[in-house]
Protein backbone atom coordinates (compact mmCIF):
# COMPACT_ATOMS: atom_id res chain seq x y z
CA UNK A 1 0.00 0.00 0.00
CA UNK A 2 1.11 3.55 -0.68
CA UNK A 3 1.42 5.80 2.38
CA UNK A 4 -1.59 7.96 1.44
CA UNK A 5 -3.70 4.80 1.02
CA UNK A 6 -2.68 3.70 4.53
CA UNK A 7 -3.51 7.14 5.94
CA UNK A 8 -6.95 7.08 4.31
CA UNK A 9 -7.62 3.46 5.37
CA UNK A 10 -6.86 4.09 9.07
CA UNK A 11 -9.90 4.35 11.32
CA UNK A 12 -10.40 4.51 15.08
CA UNK A 13 -11.88 1.11 15.92
CA UNK A 14 -13.73 0.52 19.17
CA UNK A 15 -15.01 -3.05 18.76
CA UNK A 16 -12.59 -5.99 18.71
CA UNK A 17 -12.63 -9.77 18.40
CA UNK A 18 -10.83 -11.87 21.01
CA UNK A 19 -8.11 -12.88 18.51
CA UNK A 20 -4.68 -11.72 19.67
CA UNK A 21 -2.24 -10.07 17.27
CA UNK A 22 1.04 -11.88 16.69
CA UNK A 23 4.20 -11.02 18.60
CA UNK A 24 5.92 -10.34 15.27
CA UNK A 25 3.27 -7.80 14.25
CA UNK A 26 3.39 -6.19 17.70
CA UNK A 27 7.16 -5.77 17.40
CA UNK A 28 6.75 -4.09 13.99
CA UNK A 29 4.15 -1.72 15.43
CA UNK A 30 6.39 -0.86 18.40
CA UNK A 31 9.34 -0.28 16.09
CA UNK A 32 7.25 2.19 14.07
CA UNK A 33 6.44 4.06 17.28
CA UNK A 34 10.07 4.02 18.34
CA UNK A 35 11.10 5.68 15.06
CA UNK A 36 8.62 8.55 15.38
CA UNK A 37 9.87 12.12 15.36
CA UNK A 38 10.75 13.38 18.82
CA UNK A 39 11.53 16.89 19.94
CA UNK A 40 15.24 17.62 19.99
CA UNK A 41 16.01 13.99 19.15
CA UNK A 42 16.07 13.24 22.89
CA UNK A 43 14.07 9.98 22.71
CA UNK A 44 12.48 10.72 26.10
CA UNK A 45 9.50 8.40 25.64
CA UNK A 46 8.96 4.75 26.50
CA UNK A 47 6.51 2.14 25.19
CA UNK A 48 5.08 -0.66 27.34
CA UNK A 49 3.00 -3.23 25.47
CA UNK A 50 0.46 -5.32 27.38
CA UNK A 51 0.08 -8.34 25.10
CA UNK A 52 -2.23 -10.32 27.36
CA UNK A 53 -6.03 -10.16 27.07
CA UNK A 54 -6.45 -10.86 30.79
CA UNK A 55 -4.54 -7.67 31.64
CA UNK A 56 -6.46 -5.45 29.22
CA UNK A 57 -9.94 -5.90 30.65
CA UNK A 58 -10.33 -2.22 31.59
CA UNK A 59 -13.55 -1.26 29.77
CA UNK A 60 -12.00 1.91 28.34
CA UNK A 61 -9.96 -0.33 26.04
CA UNK A 62 -13.04 -1.68 24.18
CA UNK A 63 -11.97 -5.31 24.73
CA UNK A 64 -8.86 -4.89 22.58
CA UNK A 65 -6.46 -7.79 23.29
CA UNK A 66 -3.31 -5.61 23.18
CA UNK A 67 -2.71 -2.20 24.74
CA UNK A 68 0.42 -0.09 24.26
CA UNK A 69 1.07 2.50 26.98
CA UNK A 70 3.09 5.56 25.94
CA UNK A 71 5.10 7.01 28.83
CA UNK A 72 7.01 10.31 28.68
CA UNK A 73 9.17 12.33 31.04
CA UNK A 74 7.03 14.61 33.22
CA UNK A 75 9.25 17.64 33.00
CA UNK A 76 9.57 17.74 29.20
CA UNK A 77 7.63 20.51 27.47
CA UNK A 78 6.94 18.52 24.28
CA UNK A 79 5.95 15.20 25.88
CA UNK A 80 2.42 15.28 24.45
CA UNK A 81 3.63 16.00 20.92
CA UNK A 82 6.24 13.23 21.17
CA UNK A 83 3.64 10.76 22.45
CA UNK A 84 1.15 11.51 19.69
CA UNK A 85 3.83 11.19 17.00
CA UNK A 86 4.63 7.74 18.40
CA UNK A 87 0.96 6.77 18.54
CA UNK A 88 0.26 7.90 14.97
CA UNK A 89 3.22 5.93 13.64
CA UNK A 90 1.93 2.83 15.45
CA UNK A 91 -1.59 3.31 14.04
CA UNK A 92 -0.26 3.59 10.49
CA UNK A 93 1.91 0.48 10.86
CA UNK A 94 -1.03 -1.43 12.34
CA UNK A 95 -3.22 -0.39 9.41
CA UNK A 96 -0.63 -1.63 6.93
CA UNK A 97 -0.61 -4.99 8.75
CA UNK A 98 -4.43 -5.27 8.71
CA UNK A 99 -4.68 -4.67 12.46
CA UNK A 100 -7.35 -2.39 13.91
CA UNK A 101 -6.34 0.36 16.33
CA UNK A 102 -7.42 3.40 18.29
CA UNK A 103 -5.76 6.07 20.43
CA UNK A 104 -7.13 6.33 23.97
CA UNK A 105 -6.34 9.34 26.14
CA UNK A 106 -6.53 9.58 29.95
CA UNK A 107 -3.17 7.92 30.49
CA UNK A 108 -2.20 10.26 33.31
CA UNK A 109 -5.43 9.58 35.19
CA UNK A 110 -5.16 5.82 34.68
CA UNK A 111 -1.79 5.61 36.42
CA UNK A 112 -2.42 8.31 39.07
CA UNK A 113 -3.65 5.76 41.63
CA UNK A 114 -1.43 3.74 43.94
CA UNK A 115 -2.27 0.62 41.89
CA UNK A 116 -1.25 2.44 38.71
CA UNK A 117 2.05 3.59 40.20
CA UNK A 118 2.75 0.02 41.35
CA UNK A 119 2.15 -1.27 37.80
CA UNK A 120 4.57 1.31 36.43
CA UNK A 121 7.19 0.21 38.95
CA UNK A 122 6.56 -3.46 38.13
CA UNK A 123 6.93 -2.70 34.40
CA UNK A 124 10.22 -0.86 34.91
CA UNK A 125 8.93 2.62 34.07
CA UNK A 126 11.33 5.12 35.68
CA UNK A 127 10.25 7.67 38.28
CA UNK A 128 9.27 10.97 36.70
CA UNK A 129 7.35 9.46 33.77
CA UNK A 130 3.61 9.67 33.10
CA UNK A 131 1.42 7.88 30.61
CA UNK A 132 0.34 10.26 27.85
CA UNK A 133 -2.01 7.80 26.16
CA UNK A 134 -2.65 4.32 24.86
CA UNK A 135 -2.84 2.58 21.50
CA UNK A 136 -5.24 -0.34 21.51
CA UNK A 137 -4.70 -3.09 18.95
CA UNK A 138 -6.60 -6.11 17.69
CA UNK A 139 -8.87 -7.32 14.93
CA UNK A 140 -12.08 -5.50 14.13
CA UNK A 141 -15.35 -7.11 15.18
CA UNK A 142 -17.56 -6.15 12.25
CA UNK A 143 -17.10 -4.17 9.08
CA UNK A 144 -14.45 -1.52 8.52
CA UNK A 145 -16.15 1.88 8.55
CA UNK A 146 -16.05 4.18 5.55
CA UNK A 147 -14.27 7.50 5.85
CA UNK A 148 -16.43 10.58 6.17
CA UNK A 149 -16.04 13.15 3.43
CA UNK A 150 -13.68 15.88 4.56
CA UNK A 151 -15.11 19.32 5.22
CA UNK A 152 -14.10 21.90 2.63
CA UNK A 153 -12.02 24.92 3.57
CA UNK A 154 -9.77 23.16 6.09
CA UNK A 155 -6.65 23.60 3.95
CA UNK A 156 -5.19 26.92 2.85
CA UNK A 157 -2.07 27.44 0.76
CA UNK A 158 -0.57 30.91 1.00
CA UNK A 159 2.05 32.32 -1.36
CA UNK A 160 2.19 29.48 -3.87
CA UNK A 161 0.96 31.43 -6.88
CA UNK A 162 3.10 33.24 -9.40
CA UNK A 163 4.09 36.73 -8.39
CA UNK A 164 2.97 39.26 -10.90
What are the language-model segments listed below?
Residues 1-164:
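Acidic, surface-exposed loops and disordered segments
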